Amino acid sequence: MKDNERRILLGRVVGGFGLRGEIKIESWTEPRDAIFRYQPWLLRSPTGTESMLNGARGYETGKRLIATFPGINDRNGVEAICGTEIYVPRSALPPPHPDEYYWVDLEGLQVHTLEGVVLGSVSHLFSNGANDVIVIHGERERLIPFVQPDYVKSVDFEAERIVVDWDPEF
């Protein structure tokens, strides 16, 4: 991974599973086990130490995502990396389908109404089960459903702008 390449946080190590070095992973990919498709990983420990890892394997079991990392064979090895964040370069992710977006690509874009009123910039997104929601930080925080074409009219990465059909007083 090049030093200046944008890094995307995909997950983190949350603990051990059993005694043989299996690792519980929290993954923010969709589906959760897609995290294993995007390797090598840049691992960043809670102290800021970084290392590259290739060859992680894993599987889902109930609500858990369980992984094995090369070189970690016991619970002590897992405890040493607990809290480690898992990053990949943005270039490791496949291009999204038309009219689909990676949330991370929307973060930081300015949000304008159809009338040109600037509401703020995208802080982050979350899913409420029915749809995705844009969290906008401006003079106040706003939550706008990311529903095209009802509320989100356009996304323009070159202009770094999202245009929404939204009452600025709401």
Swiss-Prot record:
GO annotation (BP), single: ribosomal small subunit biogenesis
**Molecular functions (GO terms):** ribosome binding
UniProt-annotated location(s): Cytoplasm
Q: Which GO terms describe its cellular component?
A: cytoplasm; ribosome
Q: Which SUPFAM superfamilies match?
A: PRC-barrel domain, Translation proteins
Q: Spell out the InterPro entries in the cross-references.
A: PRC_barrel-like_sf, PRC_RimM, RimM, RimM_N, RimM_N_sf, Transl_B-barrel_sf
Where would I find the PRC barrel domain in this sequence?
98-170
Keywords (A to Z) from UniProt = Chaperone, Cytoplasm, Ribosome biogenesis, rRNA processing
Q: Name one Pfam family in it.
A: PRC_RimM
- Please state the protein's primary subcellular location: cytoplasm
Query: Please, which domain of life does this record's source organism belong to?
Result: Bacteria
Protein role: An accessory protein needed during the final step in the assembly of 30S ribosomal subunit, possibly for assembly of the head region. Essential for efficient processing of 16S rRNA. May be needed both before and after RbfA during the maturation of 16S rRNA. It has affinity for free ribosomal 30S subunits but not for 70S ribosomes.
Assembly mode: Binds ribosomal protein uS19.
Q: What is known of its domains?
A: The PRC barrel domain binds ribosomal protein uS19.
**Similarity comment: family membership:** Belongs to the RimM family.
Q: What is the official name of this protein in its record? A: Ribosome maturation factor RimM
Q: What is the lineage of its organism?
A: Bacteria, Pseudomonadati, Pseudomonadota, Gammaproteobacteria, Lysobacterales
Gene transcribed to yield this protein: rimM
